[in-house]
Design a protein with these regions (language model features):
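A short, structured active-site edge motif that brings together acidic residues
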Residues: 134-145, 171-174, 236
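N-terminal binding-site loop/beta-alpha segment at the start of enzyme catalytic domains
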Residues: 2-135, 166, 196-197, 203
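CE4/NodB-like, metal-dependent polysaccharide N-deacetylase domain
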Residues: 152-172, 200-204
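Conserved beta-strand positions in the central sheet of alpha/beta enzyme cores
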Residues: 69, 107-109, 169-172, 211, ...
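Aromatic/hydrophobic pocket-lining residues that form the small-molecule binding cavity
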Residues: 93, 119, 152, 156, ...
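Beta/alpha (TIM)-barrel catalytic core signal, keyed to glycine-rich beta->alpha loops juxtaposed to Asp/Glu
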Residues: 12, 46, 51, 176-322
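Short, acidic/polar
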Residues: 86-99, 148-162, 217-224, 299-302
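Active-site mouth loops of central-metabolism enzymes
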Residues: 74-90, 141-149, 288, 292
């Protein structure tokens, strides 16, 4: 085995250098990007990306997954031709997808609620131009309000229609852990029979991998892991601030990742840049990082932190501009 670069810092030392002070950086930007506002892009701070340098992880089912995944919640917008509002710029979306695929990205993550409900359609139109077997498409059961069985199943089928596919590679119970905790989880997925339906869809092959994304109560996280259900993956918020200093309703990523790793459940990572804040550190922290690796962007440190953990399958980035 080759020796590691002597200049490479351990994660522990890196955490000591950046510390929790990184959390005080600029505010995050969410939702689809407004026209002419590229600041919401996480990719724009990474610099030039080599075409042949993508890292891939192999899932327990043998899928070759790009370590960088495309989060499709911030598609660029343009003025609507017949109204005062904005619509997704499909030509721009196509260009972004082309660039991502050319650089090795094959995992695309969306939801029925992203971009005011239009992300799946735009994502599906862009991806339809490529061989389906070359792509890994992830979307979600985002039944936050009307979670009857009928409405939830309708949402599931509508997702496949919008994405122009007859199967989903990765399907998630969206944002588990909020509301009234375990009660809300039961209302959304158990008492209405929706989880049983999705398990049957996985058995039939229309869902290749079934998992959930987590925000909120650690009791709900532990509860889902205790169920007699084989989860293929779980999506968690993980970055070097949230690792041990999660704020608000979030749980320390060190705990979340550790619980998944010891069960052999792959982790998909969201918010590696904490909504963009970890690309905008204060001058003191930037200087310390540049002293170690002057050629690397500030954001690249955050991506490397998330991507170096062996049980991480994919690190998502919401990219509006490249």
């Amino acid at each position: 085995m080759e020796k590691r670069d002597k200049e490479e810092m351990s994660r522990r030392k890196f955490l000591k250098i950046v510390g929790v002070s990184a959390a005080a950086s600029a505010a995050a930007l969410y939702g689809c990007a407004s026209e002419g506002k590229p600041a919401s892009s996480e990719a724009s701070v990474l610099g030039e990306v080599p075409v042949d340098k993508m890292t891939y992880r192999v899932s327990p089912k043998g899928e070759r997954v790009s370590l960088l995944g495309y989060g499709c919640m911030r598609w660029p917008l343009k003025p609507a031709p017949d109204s005062d509002g904005n619509v997704i710029d499909q030509d721009a979306v196509n260009e972004l997808v082309d660039y991502a695929i050319a650089h090795g990205v094959n995992y695309f993550d969306t939801s029925p609620v992203y971009c005011q409900g239009f992300s799946e359609r735009a994502t599906g139109a862009a991806l339809k131009r490529y061989p389906r077997e070359k792509l890994l498409i992830a979307t979600k059961m985002s039944n936050f309000q009307n979670y009857t069985r009928e409405n939830s199943i309708k949402m599931y089928h509508q997702s496949m229609k919008e994405l122009q596919t007859d199967y989903l590679d990765y399907y998630l119970l969206h944002s588990v852990g909020g509301g009234e905790g375990i009660k809300t989880f039961h209302d959304r997925y158990i008492d209405n029979g929706v989880l049983d339906f999705l398990l049957k869809e996985r058995e039939e092959g229309r869902i290749r991998n079934l998992g959930w994304s987590f925000h909120g109560s650690v009791e709900v996280f532990d509860y889902l892991l205790s169920l007699d259900v084989k989860w293929d993956f779980v999506q968690i918020q993980m970055n070097y601030v949230d690792w041990r200093h999660a704020s608000g309703r979030n749980v320390n990523a060190e705990y979340l990742y550790g619980e998944l790793a010891k069960r052999g459940i792959p982790a998909v990572i969201m918010e590696p840049l904490l909504g963009g804040r970890l690309s905008k550190l204060n001058d003191h922290l930037v200087a310390r990082l540049k002293q170690r690796r002057p050629e690397n962007s500030v954001a690249s440190w955050a991506f490397r932190f998330a991507g170096t953990y062996p049980n991480v399958l994919c690190v998502l980035s919401g990219m509006t501009y490249m």
